[in-house]
Amino acid sequence: MMRQSSLATRLFLSATAWLVVILAITGIVLSSVYRNATERAFDRRLNLYLRTLIAEVATPDDPPDRQFQSLGEPLFELPLSGWYWQITRSDTEKPEVRASRSLWDKKLPKLEEQGIELTAAGIRIGYVEGPENQDLRMVERPVDLGADGKFLVGVAGDASEIFDETRSFDYYLGGTFAALGIVLLLTTVFQVNYGLA
């Protein structure tokens, strides 16, 4: 009887260890996949705004005091909203900067200065710290218009959207896996006891 009890304990502990390892690895992988998918969706949104800005910059015969549109996003108009765009002309003695109203009197950091390399699509993507210590997700692209100038165009959005979504997913994923783990452990106990009976 003691030998059976000892064997049952070892089988249970072994099954528990494997279960914890498998659920942990699966949880990490799923969380990473979801975070990457959330970032890609957010980046597509930023890239849409970026392309719109670049089209505005490249439009010929514009008056120098032309105001850029809000890109269809009211948050670009609200001061320190977490959504910003910035266009820097870099081929002049003193860089000329245009920015969204939301940026107020602040400036966005440059991904180029943080050592982030251009992707195959010719853009830089990364996280930066914005005004009021905001966590921002930013896309940036250098634009060379020849005689019309060289520009660095950047768009940034509030990264808390990404963090909140992934945190919520991780919370529900953890709860689901905890419930699944309990069910599997109870099943293991039943199978071990039944098999050794």
Range-by-range predicted roles:
Residues 51, 55-56, 64-132:
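Extracytoplasmic ligand-binding sensor domains of the Cache superfamily
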Residues 14, 23-48:
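N-terminal membrane-insertion alpha helix
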Residues 27-38, 176, 180-197:
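Cytosolic-side ends of inner-membrane transmembrane helices, especially those
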Residues 43-59:
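Short extracytoplasmic/periplasmic juxtamembrane "stem" segments immediately C-terminal to an N-terminal membrane anchor
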Residues 4-23:
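N-terminal signal-anchor/signal peptide hydrophobic helix marking the start
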Residues 17-21, 172-179:
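Hydrophobic residues within alpha-helical transmembrane segments
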